Amino acid sequence: MVVLKTSKELSDMKLSCKISAQALKLAGELIKPGVSTAYVDQMLHEFIVSQGAKPTFLGYGGFPASCCISVNDEVIHGIPSGRVIEEGDIVSVDVGAAINGYTGDNAATFAAGKVSEEAQKIMDVTKECLYRAIEAAQPGNRLGDVGYAVESYAKSFGFAVVRDYVGHGVGRKLHESPSIPDRKSVV
């Protein structure tokens, strides 16, 4: 069930999302060949804390880092390590910040230097899937319409969606309703 928020609660949520988005922007500046994923995590941790917030993922369900960093074919929730990013890698970063009792959560994929045509294509198609999902998230539509917009566009380029994960709302908790599938469903 979606819990309606007051203006003050929405303001607090916007702040947490703004900090998360700024951390994600920093990640994009840090992702380059020769940098370890642990270093990126450390820098994002320090940034979030400097804003008076707490890294949402650190300790969440036992997660040992402040952000999830997945390289190439790793599917979300990658654990930062000494792994060094290489030229041509695509690196997905998922980061969250909590402040005033509310959580923000943002993710994006970045190119480390020059990437292959295939890697660039999947990044471009994925970004367009996001835009199509946003466009489909309109009054009167169902969540399945959002998922259909994502899945049908991805499939038109020969890609598939990862069926084990969904988008989600945020608020006082990291994962709140609604769950938003990335495929056509009966929702």
Give the predicted meaning of each segment.
Residues 1-187:
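Active-site neighborhoods and metal-handling regions in enzymes and metal-associated proteins
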